[in-house]
């Protein structure tokens, strides 16, 4: 069965792709280059696609900098060195307005074209504590919308939205990825990398990634600008 995977080149989407492959699906990657400051993730998505042997990889250029509203698409500072407590209970400045709504809309369009009935994305419990478009309620509502607003849906075939990491902590995601031989060394998580592409080690995404590998009892294979204290 064909599966569309929203592939950012990050840890979560790569583990998600490995889950879809484990489950016997033919992988079709969709990556969106949206003007993000960490554009290196698009290159990493290409490398991951090659490593996992995807059938096809579409990279769309949609520049969301024209809309703005996020530290990821503007020159606003990316939050650094925030504690777990600091990261809870608020929508961070790295939230990109309606990003998953946009990405999932593109994914179901791709799914219809490829006659695929599955769309995978890497949303998880760490994300939906701060990002409203990673919540289970949102994903369920989007799937219902897709049934009403697509040819596949009105013809009774539908497109299922799957987020297999939704209930997992970052440590559990890392352990799952390790069991599936995920190429962690190819993935990129940092929101504010150096010009060389090396992860800053201080943004929320870097800290969460490091916490995940630490919880899993594993060494993160990527380079950081500074060693973990």
Could you say what each language-model-derived stretch is?
Residues 1-180:
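ATP-dependent adenylation/nucleotidyltransferase module used to activate substrates
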